[in-house]
């Protein structure tokens, strides 16, 4: 399986990548992008199975990115992450 990590914070991306033994849970390839626009490009080209995505990012947020990918990758598993505690925003 392929995992795409989309987050505008490089430290977050590298921390998530280095903290988990991805191959032990069936992830063969870990891809990354630094915002929603680049995430769209990588997802369209590589067709990941799972997207681990920040909610708030410049240019295109994670929710908008996943909405645009919905028709192209209908079986994708999205997982959102956020450093914000704004519960109303996260509920959306």
Where do the language-model regions lie?
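A structural micro-motif
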Residues: 1, 27-28, 76
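Conserved acidic segment of CheY-like receiver
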Residues: 1-12, 16-17, 51
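Short, aliphatic-rich N-terminal leader segments
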Residues: 9-10, 31, 44, 55
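Alpha-helical interaction/dimerization surfaces of two-component signaling modules
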Residues: 15, 19-23, 42
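Short helix-capping segments at alpha-helix termini
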Residues: 22-26, 72-74
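A generic structural motif
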Residues: 24-30, 46
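Conserved Asp/Asn-Gly motif in the active-site loop of CheY-like receiver
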Residues: 30-37
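CheY-like receiver
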Residues: 40-41, 45-92
């Amino acid at each position: 399986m392929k995992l795409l990590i989309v987050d505008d914070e490089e430290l977050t991306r590298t921390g998530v990548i280095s903290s988990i033994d991805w191959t032990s849970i069936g992830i063969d390839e870990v891809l990354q992008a630094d915002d929603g626009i680049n995430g769209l490009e990588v997802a369209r080209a590589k067709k990941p199975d799972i997207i681990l995505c920040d909610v708030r990012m410049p240019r295109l947020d994670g929710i908008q990115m996943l909405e645009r990918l919905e028709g192209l990758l209908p079986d994708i598993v999205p997982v959102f992450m956020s450093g914000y505690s704004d519960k109303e925003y996260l509920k959306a």
